[in-house]
Amino acid sequence: MRSGRSFAVLVSLLATFALPAACGSEPRDGFGHEGDGALAGDGGGVLDDDGEAPPGELRDPVTCAEAAAARSYVGCDYWATPGANIVQDVFDFTIAVANVGSEPATVDVTGAGDLRWQITVGPGSLGKVHLPWIAELKGNAITSVTTSAVAKGSAYHVVSDRPVVVYQFSPLQFRAQGGDPGKSWSGCRKQLGADDCYSYSNDASLLLPSTAMTGTYRIMGSYGFSRRPIDESTQKPDPTKEPLPGYAPYFLVTATRDGTVVNVNLGPKGQVAAGGGIPATAAGGVVTFTLDAGDIAQVVSGVGRDYDFSGSLLTADKPVQVITGVPCIDFPLDVIACDHIEETVFPAETLGKHYVVAMPSGPTDAKVGHVVRFYGNVDGTTLTYKPQRPAGCPATLSAGDVVECGEVGIDFEVEGDHAFGVGTFLLGASKVDPQFTLLKSMGDPSQSFAVTVAQYRQKYVFLAPTDYTVSYVDVIASEGTKLTLDGEDVSSSLAPIGGTDWFAARIKLAPVNDGAHTLLSSKPTGIQVLGYGSYTSYQYPGGLNLGEIAPAPVK
């Protein structure tokens, strides 16, 4: 997840509405960065007949066929998809590829037309590829997007000859440094009073391999952005005024095969703004469109917090990828500053009945609150909580329900009798940074999804980019779990979550191995990876299994 004092923020501060802001493919010619970081740790544990731990325990797949069969975040075929963001174009949309194996991986990236890159990522190493934004999806750095669009053949197809994990960063940098060799930052526009040129609008997403995608998704995300006008005397939102609409929520659908027919049964707030051949559709209606492989549909709603695609049910006749986002948003309402949020939606069949939701690490090491949302997937879902139900959280859910608990300041466990989803959102810098100032503070909203306990893993290879001031891995584990991070025993970091049988660890990550890390555990664990920079943040699930453990919803 992102920041909200981008160029749009500066402009807005001068106005009434302010924003403080597939395996074995043939190599292709191209360019990129060869990874040079080392990942620590090889798995042990229960062995198969050949003396190896089976994939999904403490050993990642070593072939693309194994990766496809294992159905996890490890794979060989991915689709990177940039969407709407108010960040300046000079900051790079970037994919990061980590090689989970012991042999070099050749990774090809292709885009529209003749766009192509190739990198070799060494064993246990990381490679980055900086990619162009897609103009019709990104929008500009002030007004962003207000209509839907279809970008034909524009998704970035990432194909490796060996299993890897892939993340996308929108953008990667939070300040004007880095990028491809020789990159010029001279066009980066500084904010008034800032000591450097900052992006202020970042987030990141865990990408899922196409072999783990399905055609059924419960849309999980956020409403759009609104904020009350700024009181010039306090430079804060005026609580006596009504919120003004700022940015629209959206979801991105990327087709992996030609002739993919997509139907979306819209939720009660999911109005569609026409564009790109996608028809205007009222909330509660059905919108239908057809895509070919590599096409991206960015479906945009109305502007402001009265609009929300969450709870809508998307079905496609072939596997697709779905990402939800908002160009910039406050969490909670009127808390400075707004930031870009996005995350890949898990297939509906991979959602579970049991979650442990822990408060995230804050920018100064202490845990901080976050906003939690529940997404109903089946009628008649009854929820039970430990140690208690947080204020505002639901006791029951129906299919398509969306319930926002508000700001949650406790760790909790929740179980249901049917599958459901849980979203989490980092708060604005003025909430999470105790040293908050208008000119330089760490934090701002980011979107992630909790991973159900049934999809926990014992090995994670993950990325926490060293481009950020500070990054963490937050771990959920059961009693007696032994944890090793980059070869170091960190089991002592686990602390009990009162009233439950679960433990949480919040571990500050050293800026080593170009940000690539390996976590091993004696029992299945869940992880979230997050980090902070000046008026920005990112967060994503560090990985998960993607077994089909729930029936596809029918409404």
Predicted segments with their positions:
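Ser/Thr-rich, Pro/Gly/Ala-heavy low-complexity intrinsically disordered linkers and tails
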Residues: R2, A18-L58
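Topology signature of small-to-medium multi-pass alpha-helical membrane proteins
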Residues: G4-S6
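Bacterial N-terminal signal peptides
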Residues: A8-P20
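Intrinsically disordered, low-complexity linker/terminal regions across diverse proteins
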Residues: G51-K555
